[in-house]
A protein has these predicted regions:
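Extended amphipathic coiled-coil helices
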Residues: 1-3, 8-213
Length: 213
């Protein structure tokens, strides 16, 4: 598979913006036309706990110290296209893209703020899943111990170092890992968004040389 570049994402997002503008114009003139927007939810509106399978939940918790990384990967990068709501196309600048379901397209946001939102919401989901599986006796004692240690570490504000890199705290270290994870998965996320657009009956408007299989 050839790499999907940022130009392709901008092409896709422009189609979403055009659709949104067209929908608003028709509503304002009382000409109601059904516009099929991608079924993507804004950050924080995902019902992750009810969406993930028991197997996915178990797999996430079995990742132990990398459970939050695995959570973000499964939720935002894998098969749950409804949650393809954040895209990082550059590691160096301060910006990232987030989907705004009220607008119907992706908007630019502060990368650090978006990553903090993702981490906050997914940590809430992680703790909920941990409680759910723990109550159901689906977690072994070793995993329970390591997950508890991980959760405590995430709340620890002491500086954390990994290799030669110093971080303000462990949460900042994990946030950096998630940033790289999302960046490395930008091609799949972009392609899956393109497929959602196709499901919305507007795939023919995307130049054929922009979606590469």
């Amino acid at each position: 598979m050839k790499k999907i570049d940022n130009k392709t994402f901008k092409t896709i997002n422009k189609l979403l913006m055009d659709r949104s503008t067209h929908n608003t114009t028709n509503n304002n003139t009382q000409n109601i036309i059904n516009i099929n927007f991608p079924n993507i939810l804004s950050i924080g509106k995902e019902n992750v706990v009810k969406t993930l399978t028991r197997g996915e939940k178990k797999f996430i918790l079995d990742s132990r110290w990398t459970s939050i990384d695995k959570m973000v990967e499964i939720v935002h990068c894998k098969n749950h296209n409804t949650f393809k709501n954040i895209l990082i196309t550059n590691l160096k600048d301060k910006f990232a893209y987030k989907y705004d379901e009220t607008k119907g397209y992706f908007i630019t946001g502060n990368k650090t703020d978006l990553l903090d939102d993702i981490l906050t919401f997914r940590m809430i989901d992680l703790e909920t899943i941990y409680d759910e599986l723990s109550t159901a006796n689906k977690i072994d004692s070793k995993t329970k111990k390591l997950i508890q240690e991980f959760l405590d570490k995430m709340d620890n504000e002491e500086p954390f170092s990994y290799g030669d890199v110093e971080y303000p705290n462990y949460k900042s270290y994990k946030m950096n890992n998630i940033k790289i994870l999302l960046y490395n998965n930008q091609d799949k996320i972009t392609q899956d968004i393109a497929l959602l657009i196709g499901d919305g009956k507007i795939s023919n408007e995307i130049p054929k040389n922009e979606i590469i299989s």
